[in-house]
Amino acid sequence: MLTLTTLYHLAEEVNLGSIREHGLLSTARLLAQAGIPETERCAMLRRHRPECVTLPSGVLIRDQKPMPPKALAPALDDGLTPPDWYELLNGHVFLWPDRDRLERQRRACRGRPQAVLVFDGARLLRDFGGCARVSPINSGNARRRPARRGLDTLRDYAAW
C-alpha cells in the first residue's frame, strides 16, 4: 500500500474562516451549504468554471481553467462527458502528496493569497482511509497531452 506521510491542501486565504468552522468541503457541499437552489447547484456542478466563483457565503470556488471541455473530452473513457467529469471532481476535496505539486498549483493561482494546509498523512488515512481516493494523474488538468481518465481514475486508497 502506498504510504503518504504528509499531505497538502492549498486553500484560498479568504476561505480559511469557512474551513475552520466547517472543515474542508467539496465544491458540491459548499454550494449546498451556501443555499444555492438544487437546480442551479446541479447545473453549476456539471459546468466548466473558466473563472473563480464567489458564493453568497463569501467562499471562493476555484476556476477549472486547466480543464476546458474541448481538451478534456478526448481524454475521457467509460462514456464520460466533460460535464460528468466536472460533477465527479466537484464531489471531492483534493490533497497533494508532495510539496512540489502544491507549489505548482500555488503559482497557477496568480498572486491570489493562499494558505497551505499540512496534514499528517498517516493519521488522516487512518481516520478517513475508508473513503479516501488516490489518482495516478492530476485529474484536474487536461492541457497539453492529457492523460486518459475514467470511472476508475479515482481509486480506493485501500486498494491502491
Predicted regions and their residues:
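Gly/serine-rich nucleotide phosphate-binding loop at the start of the catalytic core
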Residues: M1-H48
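Conserved NAD+-utilizing ADP-ribose enzyme module
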Residues: M1-T3, E38-L72, D77-V93, P97-W160
